[in-house]
Each structure stands twice: as C-alpha cells, then as structure tokens.
A protein has these predicted regions:
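Short N-terminal or domain-adjacent regulatory/targeting segments
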Residues: 1-25, 73-78
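Charged/polar, solvent-exposed surface patches and flexible loops
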Residues: 12, 51, 55, 107, ...
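A structure-centric signal for secondary-structure junctions around beta-strands
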Residues: 26-28, 125
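Low-complexity, highly charged intrinsically disordered N-terminal segments
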Residues: 29-34, 40-51, 58-67, 73-78, ...
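Residues at alpha-helix termini
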Residues: 56-57, 112
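Glycine-rich beta-alpha loop elements in corrinoid/cobalamin-binding modules
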Residues: 66-152
Length: 152
C-alpha cells in the first residue's frame, strides 16, 4: 500500500475513534501491538496501558500496530497520533498476548527499521520492552527480542 493510502487509512480510523489521546510530554514511548489495529483495539489490556501512561503528566504514549497484510510500506511503521516513525522513539513497549504474536513482533521491528534480535540493536536504537499475557505463560521466547520483559 502506498504511504498516502496508509495515512488515509490511519486518519479514517482515528476519525471513527472515541477517546483518542494526543498529548505532549517530556517523555514519550510508542505503545506497540504485534498484530493489526482491529486485534489491538479489542485488547482491554492494551487500552488500559494506553490510558494509564497518558494519565501521567510526564509521559505520553502513542500507538503503533503491525500493518494489515496490504498495509506494509517501505516508509516503515509510524504512530497513529503524531505519525512519527517508531524507530525515532526512545522506547517501544509491546503487549504480546500469545506465542503466535512472536512472529508479528519480529515483523513489526523489521518493518520499523529496528533490528528484531536484541543483541543486534545499537545503543542509539529504541529500547524494546515486552509485557502482556504471554509473560505469565511463557516469557522465555521474548528474551530474544526484548531488552526488558515486564510481567503483566
């Protein structure tokens, strides 16, 4: 999908949303989901973290999702709120629900221009934090991708 079509799709989704938060804060993170938008927006945990982070005065969370099958572009992955490439954020926080999303996590990072494997990332690239339901069942596979794994 060309970049302008992706931007149009994102703006259409934002126009249909209720409760979108656009904030400016001293600290920002990209709140990422390793599946497409409709799957992420069905996750109460993902929405709760979005509200909790944005409820703080000193933090702002912007959302990013694995593009739909036809939504991948050479331009990478940007956040919905400011259209900032996720590779420009200091931290990427992922909610990973189950093992099948590990492939989506690797694809997301690759499409975003961030090395998927932890040991391949440089110090000037985003810190990758993983949490979500998978951490309760089997957090070990996340270690290949995450700099930090948070239970929950």
């Amino acid at each position: 999908m060309p970049r302008w079509d992706q931007t149009r799709q994102i703006r259409g989704r934002l126009d249909a949303e209720v409760g979108t938060l656009r904030r400016v804060a001293a600290r920002r993170l990209a709140l990422c989901y390793p599946s497409p938008y409709p799957v992420a927006m069905a996750s109460l945990g993902y929405q709760t973290v979005y509200r909790l982070v944005n409820g703080r005065n000193d933090w702002a969370a912007e959302r990013a999702f694995l593009p739909d099958e036809d939504g991948a572009t050479a331009a990478g992955i940007s956040t919905y709120e400011s259209e900032t490439p996720v590779a420009e954020f200091p931290a990427l926080a992922f909610s990973v629900a189950y093992e099948l999303e590990l492939a989506g996590l690797a694809r997301f990072l690759d499409q975003a221009g961030v090395p998927a494997r932890r040991e391949e990332r440089r110090a000037d690239q985003p810190l990758v934090v993983c949490g979500g339901p998978l951490t309760y069942a089997n957090a070990r596979p996340l270690g290949a991708f995450a700099d930090v794994v948070v239970s929950g």
